[in-house]
Amino acid sequence: MFRTSSASAAGSGGSRWRGPVAVAAALLGLVTAVASAQLSGPARSAAPRRTLTVATWNMCGVEQWNCRSTGSPTAKRNALEAMASRSGARVFFLQEVCAGDLDRVRADLGASWHTEFRPYTWRGVTGRTTTVRCAGAGQGAAGVALLSAYRLSAVEPVESRQPAVGLRRGILCATVADQGVRVCTAHLSRPGDDRAHPDWELRDDQLKALAAAVPGRTVYGGDLNTDPPGPRDPDSWIWPAGPYRAQRECDQASASSRSGRPTHVSGHKIDYLFSDLPRLDCSVRGTGASDHYALLLRVRTR
């Protein structure tokens, strides 16, 4: 039985979620204690490998992207490791993660953990593409990643429409071999991200590419940079048919529900986990080390 509390609307409109650093930091401190509460009580016991807990978290690890006041690299790594050791997360979808932090976390968790990484790139007006780097010695490139306690196979990026000029994020998929579950982490563009065509909407094409990339037995999601679809949201048209219908969202209370708890300090829900597998638990966790909360979904795999 899926356990959840009453979901509330996460807000709508065209607000930009990465606001001034001071505002984000203040909100982060105010709401962390509230958001860190689990959605439900202790999970029922289950046979090993019959369930899978997947977490998505935008770590806000790229300091130059208004992230300097959201927590140190050490705090971010500790929060990630705690979700693995205390919350039972076995697959992570990560956004705005630094390659150096990812390598350190994998080493701390042990040799049985596996990672896959796709860097962000910047495409200039001349067409030259460069890799986005994290600030700080040894932090390496910034990007999206999969972190898994199980071996990952059939790893591949998903091609999707990206800005002609500007920041290119992306979608990365793999199969959790021991579970036979296809997983995809995504970080979508924001309106105006294409410097050459600031009025172009890219998220509709990116969402279609993401939804088309997943077969049955899947968990997918990440930072989608949009509110849930709804009558008061002018951007609802960007959502394809699969999400919320063929695959239920972590915090989706019913077939007709399109709301969920906020996953960002601005009060918006912009982080998602969708699955066609039976959902058992959904929780939103304030880590104190990002302007995003972590979203955790436990599904039955057998």
Which residue ranges define each predicted feature?
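Metal-dependent phosphoester-hydrolase catalytic domains
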Residues: R3-T4, G11-G14, Q38-L39, A212-V219, ...
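N-terminal, active-site-proximal structural segment of metallo-dependent hydrolase catalytic domains
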Residues: F2-L109, W122-T126, R302
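Metal-dependent phosphoester/phosphodiester hydrolase catalytic core
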Residues: G170, A174-E201
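Short, flexible/disordered intra-domain loops and linkers
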Residues: Q64-S72, T126-R133, D194-P198, P229-W237
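Structured beta-strand-rich core segments of catalytic domains in phosphoester-bond hydrolases
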Residues: V97-G180, R285-G286
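Active-site beta-strand/loop signature of hydrolases that rely on acidic residues for catalysis
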Residues: T53-M59, A82-V105, L147, A174, ...
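Alpha-helical scaffold elements lining the catalytic groove of polysaccharide deacetylases
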Residues: T70-T74, P198-A212
